[in-house]
């Protein structure tokens, strides 16, 4: 029961700061019912005539004006899900309190109060208050910072609004939370559906609804109303729902519901209540913390039995065991985790890296393989139209003009190639083409066909279909070519000629796109994919995208950091290999998409580990490669910004996208780069490792210190005629130690700790406890001997002196361990802690030494230590530090150091 509560708490700890977009968990709601009234409303909207729609939402084809928008927003609220609404401060305070560690301390405090140990109860209450308030303050600051970070990468929608008092309208790009029912929006490939919509116009619109239905294949949406065959609104052709994604095509649609009134909004509360599988970070924190709690639950009864049996005072033994249990409870862990992750996220933002999901920071630091596309990552992402040629490689204005018509009139997702074509055509030619040719229709791009077409007309008698796309996909639908001004069959001779010319262009680092046309009699009705047949290959347009100057040094830096870079691209293998050569990346043997389809998972997994460059890949190829690399034990990052990258982004341990990416890519990513650069990424990786290293410090310190303390207590309890330390001493010591840990998130990290990927290793933690825990016990036992034989504190009458002596040694050694374990180097000489941590530990040590001499000493049942004690104290601490350093050197040589 307790483990279940604890695991749930750890799983949701980071998500309270930066809410994960609910989409990834939504597929769990396939069989979750929504209110019947919502289903009925959606079914009604699906078949409602368009004229009635305008009246229902008090809108019109020209769009809403500002007054109408404000009225609608006042009525329906902002377009935000319930999970995105901020909770009141008292709810946050309660959430910060109700972690398992505080609950455990509260129970122990209640027992102390019931047994009339009011001082112990007060100290425990103070510990709980400090832990809760520090966590609350840190989360409040982190939430504010996280909101600012999220605002930097917010999604937008293109909406039709009245823009002035004259009633003129225009298309505006606004944040999706500003949409209101009645708005008219545009949709294109790659867009996330921002609200529940009724389709008004659509061209080959295919939407992925897997997030709501679990169906992997996209479904077509149309503006044609018909009575639904089923009572499930998700199957209505005229409706699109928030959280789904446009795969291909274009559309105009009316917003019919926003925020928690949407289908997804009704499910959001239930989605958030359902448990998702914990990731590696959450599992690691959970395992470590449960290890410490189990250790406490086992050792406290053992301490009780030994003290009760040897001393005969079971009441005092129970209080002492209770205090030991308090000391073994890692109550500061939630604050340390929260503070470290949040501070890391803020620091990453200064490196132009926005963390959407805080627990992704650990994977960022653990990443050992980075899969990335070529375009814009290795290259400048400033594509220039270099050539426009016929099939023989001769410059052709006809090919350029055909490409311009295609790029100018297509309304889908305009990529950099379209922009380069439009910019590469002179203004006079562009004006002439626009005046002569009118658009009739278009067949949008999709990643299955890898081409797109527009249909244009110069007169009323004929239409011309202009198609451009990947060379092989265009050749698949061509039967003829234009050669020396004549149309000839596409035979083997021509295919060899085409391959020779395009290979030459590819070897020059040029990306080749084929252009084909087809003349058709003018007709009514829409054009379909089937019309892309028997085309005439006109020629090619070739683009240059030179490598960035920063790519080569960034690749070297990533390699030095232990990260292997693999290129996963849809481009030609010749172009990709040329770019890899220019940036100093050894491509080796190139694997292409068609080869992958013939391989089993085991074969591809082995091949993927030794291959650097994959070319001509589909989105599913990329996803499969990433999944298999993960299966082999790698922590895999994937960097992409296109629709075709979304499956791989979701499959990766850490999805990385850029601010200018399509909506679906940004939604799927864990981390957003404000600058598409491997150098920025490398800096982010290093910061991620620093964050993880500081979090690991607290866990290692706590684990080893607790192990040593319990061992010392057991030895003392077995042989001393009195308690080695009173319960309140243990509580005060633990309280002071907690204070010294507050500054750990601000600590420095040695360079060698960030030179390689860092991962959770529970086995290493257990080994670390066994190695370093008993060291403090050795010097604790020496202290027992010192107080017993040198200072003759060996009777119940002199036990206060004994307890005061061990109180100071225990507190100082426990505080010094912070400096000893934070680095593999020699502390204070080769590696210094940050000033905040140094100041906090010095203050705690001074307070610890001063307490036996202070006016509080009698109340705390401590006594002033003789001056002769302090040379021994220095010797014990020096010996402790020396032995720890020697063991640390052996340990790091044998097992390494995280």
Regions inferred by a protein language model and the residue ranges of each:
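Helix-interface capping motifs at the ends of transmembrane segments in multi-pass membrane proteins
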Residues: 103-123, 163-166, 291-329, 342, ...
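Non-lumenal N-terminal regulatory segments of integral membrane proteins
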Residues: 1-180, 185-193, 198-206, 210-217, ...
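Alpha-helical transmembrane segments of multi-pass membrane proteins
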Residues: 95-114, 128, 132, 154-155, ...
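Soluble-to-membrane junctions at the N-terminal ends of transmembrane alpha-helices
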Residues: 78-110, 143, 230-239, 270-298, ...
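Basic, amphipathic juxtamembrane/active-site segments
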Residues: 206, 213, 223-224, 380-401, ...
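Cytosolic catalytic regions of ATP/NTP-dependent phosphoryl-transfer enzymes
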Residues: 239-247, 363-537, 543, 556-557, ...
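Membrane-embedded transport module
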Residues: 303, 334, 341-343, 587-638, ...
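Hydrophobic alpha-helical transmembrane segments
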Residues: 115, 123-154, 161, 277-372, ...
């Amino acid at each position: 029961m307790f483990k279940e509560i604890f695991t749930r708490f750890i799983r949701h700890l980071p998500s309270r700061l930066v809410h994960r977009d609910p989409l990834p968990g939504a597929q769990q709601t396939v069989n979750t019912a929504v209110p019947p009234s919502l289903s009925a409303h959606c079914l009604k909207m699906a078949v409602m005539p368009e004229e009635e729609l305008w009246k229902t939402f008090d809108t019109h084809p020209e769009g809403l004006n500002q007054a109408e928008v404000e009225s609608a927003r006042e009525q329906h609220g902002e377009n935000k899900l319930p999970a995105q609404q901020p909770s009141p401060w008292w709810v946050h305070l309660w959430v910060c309190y109700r972690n398992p560690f505080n609950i455990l301390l509260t129970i122990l405090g209640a027992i102390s109060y019931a047994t009339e140990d009011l001082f112990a109860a007060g100290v425990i209450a103070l510990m709980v208050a400090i832990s809760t308030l520090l966590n609350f303050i840190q989360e409040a600051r982190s939430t504010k910072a996280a909101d600012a970070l999220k605002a930097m990468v917010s999604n937008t929608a293109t909406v039709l609004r009245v823009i002035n008092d004259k009633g003129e309208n225009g298309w505006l790009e606004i944040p999706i939370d500003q949409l209101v029912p009645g708005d008219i929006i545009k949709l294109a490939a790659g867009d996330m559906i921002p609200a529940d919509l009724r389709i008004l116009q659509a061209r080959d619109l295919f939407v992925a609804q897997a997030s709501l239905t679990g169906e992997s294949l996209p479904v077509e949406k149309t503006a044609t109303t018909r009575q639904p065959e089923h009572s499930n609104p998700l199957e209505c052709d005229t409706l699109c729902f928030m959280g789904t994604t446009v795969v291909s095509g274009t559309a105009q649609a009316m917003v019919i519901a926003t925020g928690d009134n949407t289908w997804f909004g009704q499910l959001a509360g239930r989605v958030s209540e359902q448990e998702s599988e914990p990731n590696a970070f959450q599992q690691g924190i959970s395992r470590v913390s449960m290890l410490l709690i189990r250790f406490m639950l086992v050792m406290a009864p053992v301490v009780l039995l030994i003290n009760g049996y040897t001393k005969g005072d079971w009441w005092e033994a129970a209080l002492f065991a209770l205090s030991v249990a308090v000391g073994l409870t890692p109550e500061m862990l939630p604050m340390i985790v929260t503070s470290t992750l949040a501070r890391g996220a803020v620091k990453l933002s200064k490196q132009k890296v926005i963390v959407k999901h805080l627990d992704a920071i650990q994977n960022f630091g653990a990443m050992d393989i980075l899969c990335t596309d070529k375009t814009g990552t290795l290259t400048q992402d400033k594509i220039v139209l270099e050539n426009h040629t016929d099939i023989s490689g001769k410059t052709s204005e006809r090919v350029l003009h055909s490409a311009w018509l295609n790029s100018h009139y297509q309304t889908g997702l305009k990529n950099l190639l379209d922009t380069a074509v439009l910019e590469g055509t002179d203004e006079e030619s562009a004006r002439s083409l626009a005046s002569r040719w009118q658009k009739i229709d278009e067949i949008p791009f999709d990643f299955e066909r890898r081409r797109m077409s527009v249909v244009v007309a110069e007169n009323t008698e004929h239409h011309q279909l202009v198609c451009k796309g990947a060379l092989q996909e265009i050749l698949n639908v061509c039967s003829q070519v234009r050669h020396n001004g004549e149309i000839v069959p596409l035979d083997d001779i021509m295919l060899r000629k085409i391959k020779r010319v395009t290979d030459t262009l590819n070897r020059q680092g040029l990306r080749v796109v084929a252009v084909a046309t087809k003349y058709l009699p003018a007709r009514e009705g829409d054009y379909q994919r089937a019309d892309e047949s028997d085309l005439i290959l006109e020629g090619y347009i070739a683009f240059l995208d030179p490598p960035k100057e920063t790519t080569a040094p960034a690749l070297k830096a990533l390699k030095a950091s232990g990260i292997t870079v693999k290129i996963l691209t849809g481009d030609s293998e010749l172009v990709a290999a040329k770019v890899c050569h220019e940036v100093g990346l050894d491509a080796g043997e190139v694997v292409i998409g068609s080869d992958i389809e013939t391989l089993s998972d085991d074969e591809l997994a082995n091949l993927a580990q030794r291959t650097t460059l994959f070319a001509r890949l589909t989105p599913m190829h990329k996803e499969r490669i990433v999944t298999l690399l993960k299966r082999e034990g790698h922590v895999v990052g994937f960097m992409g910004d296109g629709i075709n990258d979304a499956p791989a982004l979701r499959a990766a341990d850490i999805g990385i996208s850029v601010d200018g990416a399509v909506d679906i890519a940004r939604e799927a990513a864990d981390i957003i780069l404000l600058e598409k650069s491997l150098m920025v990424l490398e800096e982010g990786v290093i910061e991620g490792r620093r964050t993880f290293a500081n979090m690991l410090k607290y866990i290692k310190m706590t684990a080893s210190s607790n192990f040593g303390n319990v061992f010392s207590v057991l030895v003392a309890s077995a042989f001393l005629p009195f308690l080695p330390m009173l319960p309140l001493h243990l509580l005060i010591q633990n309280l002071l130690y907690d204070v010294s840990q507050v500054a750990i998130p601000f600590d420095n990290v040695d360079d060698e700790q960030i030179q390689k990927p860092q991962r959770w290793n529970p086995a290493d933690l257990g080994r670390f406890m066994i190695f370093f825990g008993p060291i403090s016990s050795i010097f604790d036992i020496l202290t027992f001997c010192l107080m017993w034989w040198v200072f003759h504190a060996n009777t119940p009458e002199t036990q206060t002196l004994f307890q005061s002596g061990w109180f100071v040694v225990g507190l100082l050694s426990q505080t010094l361990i912070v400096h000893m374990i934070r680095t593999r180097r020699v502390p204070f000489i080769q590696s210094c802690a940050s000033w905040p941590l140094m100041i906090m530990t010095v203050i705690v040590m001074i307070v610890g030494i001063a307490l036996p001499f202070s006016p509080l000493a009698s109340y705390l049942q401590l006594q002033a230590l003789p001056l002769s004690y302090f040379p021994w104290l220095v010797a014990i601490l020096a010996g402790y530090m020396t032995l720890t350093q020697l063991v640390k050197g052996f340990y790091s040589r044998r097992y390494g150091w995280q």
